[in-house]
Amino acid sequence: KGKQMVLITTANFRSGGKSSIARLLAEKLNTTILNFDKKRDSEAYNVVSTINIPENKSIERKEDCLILRDKTTEQTIKTKSNYLICDLGGYFDERLVDLKSDFYIIPSFDDYESISESMRTAHYILKNNIKAKIIFVLNGAFIVDKTTKDEKIKEFQEHIEVNGFNRFTTLFLPKTALMRKLVDENTKKDDLKGKFEQNIKYKNVDKFVDELIKLII
């Protein structure tokens, strides 16, 4: 019998860097991304193994795999690592409600709207899955200096408290050119490291990914 599968979903009704985080995580966990964003053909440009999930398929979760079905075919999705990552578009796919992910990662940029939407996303998830384990990520893509960073983290924490989400962990993802490069060069993070002597620059991202993994494993 297969090992139990761990399902991880990146979600936010607005943008917050969901796909970038999904990619970093998939690379580190050596697993596959299920892309639910119908506007993006991630299969085409993700180097990390990615499967686009068509709208017309139903999804059923078994202990060690997911089963995709339409009228004529059935497809089993199973990974060697036993981890599977669902990357959502800008809405919460109804099919994911029943799947009850083991972890939900909700990334947010630092602007008011993005933060509000990430809180709304968390409420929505908890309404359907009261035991949901949520990890908030404040994405510092637009934060340029330490003072702003400290202010923004404080602001974000205030939102967390007001919404009663203190029991969940919040991680900070530092600003990095890495995400852009991963797409432009169509490569993986670890392959990039050798190419540019920028280990130091990416150390913060490594640290972020390691912290994220510790919460999941």
Which stretches of residues belong to each language-model region?
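Walker A (P-loop) phosphate-binding motif
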Residues: 3-29
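Conserved beta-strand segments of the P-loop GTPase G domain that flank and frequently precede/overlap
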Residues: 11, 34-35, 84-87, 104-109, ...
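Short beta-strand-centered segment that lines the nucleotide-binding/catalytic pocket of NTP-utilizing
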Residues: 29-45
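Switch II (G3) loop of P-loop NTPases
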Residues: 77-97
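Inter-motif core of Ras-like GTPase G domains
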Residues: 92-112
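Conserved C-terminal guanine-recognition region of P-loop GTPase G domains, centered on the G4
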Residues: 115-140
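Beta-strand-loop-alpha "switch" segments that mediate conformational coupling across diverse proteins
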Residues: 147-194
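NTP-binding/hydrolysis catalytic cores, primarily Walker-type P-loop NTPases
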Residues: 188-217
